[in-house]
Amino acid sequence: MRKLLLIIGMFFMMAIVGNAQRKRAFMVGISHYDTALTGYQWNNINGTNDVQLLSPILKKQGFYLSTLLDDQATYQNITSLLSTFTNQTKKGDIVYLHFSTHGQPVEDINGDEEDGWDEAIIPIDAYKIYKKRVYEGKKHLLDDQLNTYIKKLRTKIGPSGILYVVIDACHAGTSSRANDETVRGTKVGFTYNNKVFKPSSQKKSHYKVDASAKMSHVMYLEACRPDQVNMEIKVKDRRYGPLSYNISQALQTKPLTTNAAEFLNSVKASIMNGGYWPNNQNLVTETSF
């Protein structure tokens, strides 16, 4: 009888462990864009610093990390690892996606964007300029494609978990250094028909995302509005994306849980009081709650 109770107890414990809420993070950081891979078209930034800053904090909070840095962060590697990461996600997981890269507006060809431009995350091997039969945009990670992964993640996580998506990039930057400052992104649109990108001024800093009883909630944190530049900050002689740095500060006091609103308040408090947020740059949030 005692042996039977022991076996039943072991199965019960295994069931509890198997259904325990897991914490998982997928992070991409690129610094050294200035390579022959893209004909030296992009300036270098400091995206790897962001991932290196956040990784030990998330590990301490029990997150399992999947990271791609610099040369690892090709389009193929990002999409392949993100597919695997998504497929391995389970009900109730707390999932954190993070991109510290360049961004670029891309001419919309399927007509789903009001302003005529998609937004893209730029892998290490994506060119800045369209050139027929040489580079036609296949290595740009478009927001439409990223949204496909996000919908699948939310479905797999279900209503008992949460998804965070952090974009510390920019789709309207000047891609240049001025006064010892580094900007992420470019104001040059990736266009197939010589279309000129003209960012429209936007006042909104919060958007609603569709919610579903069968999906997890999601919160996007984005470093700036579409018409603004994402200016890196300097802390103790190291440069970071401002959003990444302020998230790191918020995590010191408020670990990531399913309470996304509470965490957002901590990030905003760091931005307001920490002294490391660029002028004329607004945090943008998108939430399903």
Q: Residue spans of the language-model regions?
A:
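Residue-level detector of intrinsically disordered/flexible regions characterized by low predicted structural confidence
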Residues: 4-5, 165
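Cysteine endopeptidase catalytic domains of the caspase/legumain-like
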Residues: 20-289
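Hydrophobic h-region of N-terminal signal peptides that target proteins for export
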Residues: 5-18
